[in-house]
Amino acid sequence: MNEVSVIKEGWLHKRGEYIKTWRPRYFLLKSDGSFIGYKERPEAPDQTLPPLNNFSVAECQLMKTERPRPNTFVIRCLQWTTVIERTFHVDSPDEREEWMRAIQMVANSLKQRGPGEDAMDYKCGSPSDSSTSEMMEVAVNKARAKVTMNDFDYLKLLGKGTFGKVILVREKATGRYYAMKILRKEVIIAKDEVAHTVTESRVLQNTRHPFLTALKYAFQTHDRLCFVMEYANGGELFFHLSRERVFTEDRARFYGAEIVSALEYLHSRDVVYRDIKLENLMLDKDGHIKITDFGLCKEGISDGATMKTFCGTPEYLAPEVLEDNDYGRAVDWWGLGVVMYEMMCGRLPFYNQDHERLFELILMEEIRFPRTLGPEAKSLLAGLLKKDPKQRLGGGPSDAKEVMEHRFFLSINWQDVVQKKLLPPFKPQVTSEVDTRYFDDEFTAQSITITPPDRYDSLDPLELDQRTHFPQFSYSASIRE
């Protein structure tokens, strides 16, 4: 067991992920890859004071830029299948070089340790991400045959964003249908500024839960990263709610219970999902919930390595996320509160087109309920949408149990939930696996344009050079089935 030591420490200015202000943080970079930020300089490196920022530099990509401030550097990596960034600046070019060299050295040493050694549970991102080792293990495809683009028929476009697209595909060998998320490498790699790139996929290898989308394969082409995931064709919950405007409390209770069951499973494995929102909640063909990771940045990335525009759905952000403080499992209970409020009230709990005003509402505004809402539902939502994560329902040490024991869920048998014994309140009227009536025809009506598959199997040396940014980015579920 290697002893963890502090490699470098000092003051950095960290840019808020959402409220784009710069905050001074005292950071410790440790030999195990952890990169921990405090409001004040800690008296001792091993002190128990909780940090405000806690993530890992293992297998990250480093970039430097002079925007939006001189001497800025960016740490970028994949969180599940979504690109995330953290931005810092220092006072001088020399100081920036020192930090980048130190981070690079730690990342390299972790990479060289090899499987089974200390600190090989590659983690990245925020505090919640940094404990996702079980679901983000290094994936090396030892399957008998390598998966390529040629192995699939491309049927319909399901979604599209700045980073890439999600396509309904059919695996030729088995006839099975999947959703393939295709990310363009050029938006993940800032070509001339890469000091170190993501070198292995962090994938949802070990998820085994009825309400979580499973990953079947991950592979790459010369210019794409591809994730082949379970396909749920009942459509987004967002699609159904926008049609019906509001769900009955019973219907919301059913969906809420399945989401709680999935979150309990993730939290028991020290994984915080972080992104509960209607668009990430799908229905399968029978009407059960499937939490997906199809997230595509809809608002885009402007030019420059660090110019990340607001990407994501700000209406769902918890107060502690906005304040850029360390956050844990309670962030998921806030997300549950927002989606259940939408289901039962027909609108978001906090909304304003102006992001700054919206953030103010999330941080300060008291929650309001329609008169038609029952007392148990009001009590549940008020508990889930408490501003202080420590006071929030589910924010205590018993986590999901607190939520499960709330009187709103009194009629729910949780064993029956996980065993799918409860009858879904709505069964999607799909006629076949390729029936996409519950997907937005803005996408499904479009023709699919991807580079012809044969292009991927005859890479020239220049194209192979780009592949070296993502060595061993491959995975097949069959190796553990």
Swiss-Prot record:
PROSITE patterns: AGC_KINASE_CTER (PS51285), PH_DOMAIN (PS50003), PROTEIN_KINASE_ATP (PS00107), PROTEIN_KINASE_DOM (PS50011), PROTEIN_KINASE_ST (PS00108). It is a peripheral membrane protein. The keyword Repeat does not apply. Residues 410-481 form the AGC-kinase C-terminal domain. Glycans are attached at S128, S131, T306, T313, S474. Keywords: Acetylation, Apoptosis, ATP-binding, Carbohydrate metabolism, Cell membrane, Cytoplasm, Developmental protein, Disulfide bond, Endosome, Glucose metabolism, Glycogen biosynthesis, Glycogen metabolism, Glycoprotein, Kinase, Manganese, Membrane, Metal-binding, Nucleotide-binding, Nucleus, Phosphoprotein, Serine/threonine-protein kinase, Sugar transport, Transferase, Translation regulation, Transport, Ubl conjugation. Changing S478D: Mimics phosphorylation, promoting activity. Residues 152-409 form the Protein kinase domain. GO terms for cellular component: cell cortex; cytoplasm; cytosol; early endosome; nucleoplasm; plasma membrane; ruffle membrane. GO terms for molecular function: ATP binding; metal ion binding; protein kinase activity; protein serine kinase activity; protein serine/threonine kinase activity. Pfam families: PH, Pkinase, Pkinase_C. CDD domains: PH_PKB (cd01241), STKc_PKB_beta (cd05595). One of its GO terms (biological process) is positive regulation of cell migration. Its EC number is 2.7.11.1. The keyword Secreted does not apply. The modification Phosphoserine is found at S34, S126, S447, S474, S478. It is found in: Cytoplasm; Nucleus; Cell membrane; Early endosome. It is an enzyme of class 2 (transferase). The modification Phosphothreonine is found at T309, T451. Phosphorylation on Thr-309 and Ser-474 is required for full activity. Phosphorylation of the activation loop at Thr-309 by PDPK1/PDK1 is a prerequisite for full activation. Phosphorylated and activated by PDPK1/PDK1 in the presence of phosphatidylinositol 3,4,5-trisphosphate. Phosphorylation by mTORC2 in response to growth factors plays a key role in AKT1 activation: mTORC2 phosphorylates different sites depending on the context, such as Ser-474 or Ser-478, thereby facilitating subsequent phosphorylation of the activation loop by PDPK1/PDK1. Belongs to the protein kinase superfamily. AGC Ser/Thr protein kinase family. RAC subfamily. AKT2 is one of 3 closely related serine/threonine-protein kinases (AKT1, AKT2 and AKT3) called the AKT kinases, and which regulate many processes including metabolism, proliferation, cell survival, growth and angiogenesis. This is mediated through serine and/or threonine phosphorylation of a range of downstream substrates. Over 100 substrate candidates have been reported so far, but for most of them, no isoform specificity has been reported. Interacts with BTBD10. Interacts with KCTD20. Interacts (via PH domain) with MTCP1, TCL1A and TCL1B; this interaction may facilitate AKT2 oligomerization and phosphorylation, hence increasing kinase activity. Interacts with PHB2; this interaction may be important for myogenic differentiation. Interacts (when phosphorylated) with CLIP3/ClipR-59; this interaction promotes cell membrane localization. Interacts with WDFY2 (via WD repeats 1-3). Binding of the PH domain to phosphatidylinositol 3,4,5-trisphosphate (PtdIns(3,4,5)P3) following phosphatidylinositol 3-kinase alpha (PIK3CA) activation results in AKT2 recruitment to the plasma membrane, exposition of a pair of serine and threonine residues for phosphorylation by membrane-associated PDPK1/PDK1 and activation. This is RAC-beta serine/threonine-protein kinase. It comes from Mus musculus.
